[in-house]
């Protein structure tokens, strides 16, 4: 059993993009920014507990940080982890529906 404190730290924010909204409409998949050290099991447990929906599968990937310039200084943004969470049939979770 994963502790509740950990579950609250796993999910960072919804990732809102054109690709994410298309995935929600077509395949009932939500896209989330998650903690870099989060596992698929932790992500699944956190989504099920916090949003009270049934999760079918979780796919994750690490997004590499971009190199950015500020004047002559060159810096790099941090890497972050993205999770595609597919919900079971009949389940619904809409982050961007009210934005229209």
UniProtKB/Swiss-Prot annotation:
Superkingdom field: Bacteria
Query: InterPro entries this protein is in?
Result: Nucleotide-bd_a/b_plait_sf (IPR012677), Ribosomal_uL23-like (IPR013025), Ribosomal_uL23/eL15/eS24_sf (IPR012678), Ribosomal_uL23_CS (IPR001014)
Report whether Oxidoreductase shows up as a keyword of the record: no
Respond yes or no to whether keyword Oxidoreductase is given for this record. no
Instruction: State the GO CC annotations.
Output: ribonucleoprotein complex; ribosome
Tell me the keywords, alphabetical order: Ribonucleoprotein, Ribosomal protein, RNA-binding, rRNA-binding
A GO MF annotation of the entry reads: structural constituent of ribosome
Gene Ontology terms describing biological process: translation
Q: Which NCBIfam families match?
A: PRK05738.1-1, PRK05738.1-3, PRK05738.2-4
Protein name as catalogued: Large ribosomal subunit protein uL23
Origin organism of this chain? Salmonella choleraesuis (strain SC-B67)
Identify the taxonomic lineage of the organism of origin.
Bacteria, Pseudomonadati, Pseudomonadota, Gammaproteobacteria, Enterobacterales
């Amino acid at each position: 059993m994963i502790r509740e404190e950990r579950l609250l730290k796993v999910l960072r924010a919804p990732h809102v993009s054109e690709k994410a909204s298309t995935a929600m409409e077509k395949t009932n998949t939500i896209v989330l920014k998650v903690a870099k050290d989060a596992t698929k099991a932790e992500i699944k447990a956190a989504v099920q507990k916090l949003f009270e929906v049934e999760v079918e599968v979780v796919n994750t990937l690490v997004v590499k940080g971009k190199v950015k310039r500020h004047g002559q200084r060159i810096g790099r943004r941090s890497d972050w982890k993205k999770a595609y969470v597919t919900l079971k049939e009949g389940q619904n979770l809409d982050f961007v529906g009210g934005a229209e």
